[in-house]
Amino acid sequence: MNIRLVGLSILSIFIIVPLSKLAAQEPFNQNFSPDITAPDGFRSNRTSYSAIMDVLEPPVTEVTEEQLQRLRDVPLEVIFGAIGDYRLNYATGFENTQPGKRLVGRALTMRFLPPRPDLTEAALTLAKEGNWDRRYYARAAEEANPGDVVVAELGGSDGHNLFGDMGATGIQMRGAAGVIIDGGMRDYTGLRDERFEDFPVFYKFSDPHTTSWLGVEYNTPVRIGGVTVLPGDIVVGDTGGVFFFPS
């Protein structure tokens, strides 16, 4: 008996049977639409829904200003040794408008995308429905809490810029601790002014153009460099890079 032929015959059974079952299945309906109707005003109520955040349900731990103050004096190496499996949540490659100034606070996240006609039209539709502003830095100037760090996903070194000194002023006036931009900023000279000495901005590049990218998600998970940042994460930024970890 040819053992090789027997082996091939047995293997063919395991291949043919699943394929035959697959062939009997109903084809996926590409036009399927879930029977869900959003309540009036839901789309434009300034909240970006995230299913993954519903599942994660990160615990809301009140981090006091005193605790944040302590982190300003803890070496990054000590933090590295204390955060366990979150050690890899460390993003690098930033410049700092206030060299040597550490940035500590809670993450207020936002995500931006390059404009295209249909996306721009969608943003305009939401603006007509309610209080929706694609310039999420302006929204942060209305909603940020003291100690927040605005964390903006803007495509890294190939992306666009977020804001300039006027946008930063609004966020600073809310008591926010600073900003981290995975992308660019404008008004480099202005943001290095002494009035921003306690408001460091970590950024990838400086660009004089005004921003044109659209804010699409607010206070949802974002990607900064090669790491994931969740709303409310503790942020510790220093020379060399930034740690993000749960509170």
Model-identified regions with their sequence ranges:
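Acidic, glycine-rich flexible loop/linker segments
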Residues: 204-247
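Bacterial N-terminal signal peptides that target proteins for export
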Residues: 1-9
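Extracellular/luminal Protease-associated
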Residues: 132, 138-183
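N-terminal low-complexity or amphipathic/hydrophobic leaders
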Residues: 55-130
